[in-house]
């Protein structure tokens, strides 16, 4: 039986080189990243797992809640680029944006907690005449 999956909300998050596309679906509370469960994809890293669950915890939403409540959302994520920490932070921003699209009342709580603020720090470009972004070749006085 193929059931049509209805996307309830979408969100895109970026951090460093990582880009995460997040979709919220009605379901059983699964968190899938690139086809794998979140714990498996993030290699059981507690910092990354806490980061991606933080927007849900802020709203007191539990993935394993009752079947008849609003809290049974499947979160499907496609993420590419960057490292594991950058990807986790991109997912966190994408989830927060998707939750805001899903229910506008969540926006104030997420905004006050800083989940909707994108971290704008990226790698600085290399300049000509220098070895790296700021590292200059050794200076010879004579």
UniProtKB/Swiss-Prot annotation:
GO terms for cellular component: chloroplast; small ribosomal subunit. Its main location: plastid. Keywords: Chloroplast, Plastid, Ribonucleoprotein, Ribosomal protein. It holds the Pfam family Ribosomal_S9. One of its GO terms (molecular function) is structural constituent of ribosome. It is found in: Plastid, Chloroplast. One of its GO terms (biological process) is translation. InterPro entries: Ribosomal_Su5_D2-typ_SF, Ribosomal_uS9, Ribosomal_uS9_bac/plastid, Ribosomal_uS9_CS, Ribsml_uS5_D2-typ_fold_subgr. Belongs to the universal ribosomal protein uS9 family. HAMAP family: Ribosomal_uS9_B. This is Small ribosomal subunit protein uS9c.
């Amino acid at each position: 039986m193929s059931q049509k999956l209805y996307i309830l909300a979408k969100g895109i998050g970026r951090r460093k080189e990582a880009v995460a596309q997040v979709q919220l679906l009605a379901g059983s509370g699964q968190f899938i990243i690139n086809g794998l469960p979140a714990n498996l994809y993030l290699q059981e890293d507690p910092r990354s797992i806490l980061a991606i669950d933080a927007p849900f915890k802020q709203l007191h939403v539990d993935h394993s809640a009752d079947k008849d409540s609003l809290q049974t959302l499947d979160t499907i994520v496609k993420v590419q680029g960057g490292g594991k920490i950058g990807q986790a932070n991109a997912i966190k921003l994408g989830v927060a944006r998707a939750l805001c699209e899903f229910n506008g009342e969540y926006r104030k709580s997420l905004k006050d907690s800083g989940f909707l603020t994108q971290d704008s720090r990226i790698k600085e470009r290399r300049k000509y005449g220098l070895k790296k972004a700021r590292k200059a070749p050794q200076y010879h006085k004579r």
